[in-house]
From Swiss-Prot:
Recorded superkingdom: Bacteria
Keywords, alphabetical: Cytoplasm, Ribosome biogenesis
Name of this chain's protein: Ribosome-binding factor A
InterPro entries per the UniProt record, alphabetical: KH_dom-like_a/b, RbfA, RbfA_dom_sf, Ribosome-bd_factorA_CS
GO molecular function, one term: ribosomal small subunit binding
Function: One of several proteins that assist in the late maturation steps of the functional core of the 30S ribosomal subunit. Associates with free 30S ribosomal subunits (but not with 30S subunits that are part of 70S ribosomes or polysomes). Required for efficient processing of 16S rRNA. May interact with the 5'-terminal helix region of 16S rRNA.
Species whose genome carries this gene: Alkalilimnicola ehrlichii (strain ATCC BAA-1101 / DSM 17681 / MLHE-1)
Family statement: Belongs to the RbfA family.
Compartment(s) where it occurs, according to its Swiss-Prot or TrEMBL record: Cytoplasm
PROSITE patterns assigned: RBFA
Subunit structure: Monomer. Binds 30S ribosomal subunits, but not 50S ribosomal subunits or 70S ribosomes.
Predominant location: cytoplasm
Length: 130
């Protein structure tokens, strides 16, 4: 696992906040719905930033389209970030779909199913008093 450096983490957090605002307020692409910027990891030399995004309520196709739209707008977003951030060089933005939400949703459904099966099993094991 790569070592975490305080400066890269701070820059990543600031880029995350600013990008979320810029995507919401500045991008006017009709293909872009509600987008969550869930994490930004910045390389040690601050040259590259991986931006993890999810289209809210979106399918895999919607998420792929969102990543494509944001990738095409990366230069514009980088320019806007340069106007807001106080760093010498704004990292190149690399957008990726964040699968953590999907995995969390899947785990939640599996847990719900297991609880329901356990409840049914428990109800079947009860003796009939009547």
């Amino acid at each position: 696992m790569p070592r975490d450096f305080p400066r890269t983490r701070r820059v990543g957090e600031q880029i995350q906040r600013e990008l979320a605002e810029l995507i919401r307020d500045e991008l006017r692409d009709p293909r872009l719905g509600m987008v969550t910027v869930s994490e930004v990891t910045v390389s040690r030399d601050l040259a590259h930033a991986k931006v993890f995004v999810t289209a809210l309520g979106g399918s895999d196709e919607d998420n792929a389209k969102t990543v494509e739209v944001l990738t095409r707008a990366a230069g514009y977003l980088r320019k806007l970030l340069g106007q807001r951030l106080r760093i010498r060089q704004v990292p190149a933005l690399h957008f990726q779909h964040d699968t953590a939400f999907d995995r969390g949703d899947r785990l939640s459904r599996l847990i719900d199913e297991a609880v329901e099966e356990d409840r049914q099993q428990h109800d079947d094991d009860k003796p009939d008093n009547g």
